[in-house]
């Protein structure tokens, strides 16, 4: 599965907990938004993460 910023952004906008986690990553790690989104992808979606199925569903709609 490949990282797609547009799909990841949609997923974040649909889930408040992902949005909150994104903010937390930005502050704690001092990352800019794009890198924080990518980090969130690797922690919450990639490698059978809890949001992998929803991400794949959104990706199919693209």
Map each language-model feature to its residues.
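Compact alpha-helical subdomains of small soluble proteins
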Residues: 53-56, 61
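A general structural motif at alpha-helix termini
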Residues: 40-44, 59
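N-terminal acidic leader/helix
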Residues: 1-29, 34-35, 43-54
């Amino acid at each position: 599965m490949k990282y797609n910023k547009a799909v990841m952004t949609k997923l974040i906008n649909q889930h408040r907990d992902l949005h909150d986690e994104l903010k937390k990553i930005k502050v704690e790690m001092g990352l800019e938004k794009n890198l924080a989104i990518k980090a969130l992808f690797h922690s919450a979606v990639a490698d059978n993460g809890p949001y992998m199925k929803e991400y794949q569903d959104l990706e199919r709609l693209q």
